[in-house]
């Protein structure tokens, strides 16, 4: 991404910001939604440069080659939107941390992710000039688990796309909705057991086998427009995850005015405040009771991606200065 400082600061020399877009491979995952929202709203010209690396080992090898080259190519700032990044950097490094689940519960992840993260996460965060946390909850964990100085962390909450509003078509039927990459921490087995009637599930399959209960309708990946229809028509969103650093589906449902059932702890209360029904994600009866108590909130937006882009661009400006 070519970021021109004169666009914001009255004719100062241009800066060049390199952004690792590898997470876009995950399509609908939260990290991909974050990166897509950021890239779409940065007020700078964008130039895409491709480095082929299809396997994990080739990706690591490519990182070893291309990250050091950024300084030679004149980059002023490097932004890694996940933990994947250099262990040292001659260019000021920005790292976005979405959560620390891989350190808190490594058993939720496959062997490659566990091994790589145990090695990489502390080193990448240590190398960063600035760490962006998507919530105050994630900031606290960075301080507590990795001893990151609080002054090095900026909290920039996630946002939702403009399509998520209460106005518009609704999906038909009587159903509860679950949204997210299908992996153990998303707690789908308990959610399905708690839902009486149809549960529609939006998301790609991640790691960890998930059996298909008879009341579950798998929708896979859907467009934002279709997802907004599903939020508007749902009896409620059931987002009883065992752990989250933010929870973009909660923010999307809130923007659509969809009733929300979500977990105590993690960052969900930070996102939804008093506009959700909170449950114990480890207790099926608690989730079932929460679904029965769910209420329709007054629609509101946590933030817009333009806000996220402005805050992030200000960090680039500061580090390049």
List each language-model region with its residue ranges.
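Carbohydrate transferase catalytic cores enriched for Leloir-type hexosyltransferases
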Residues: 1-321
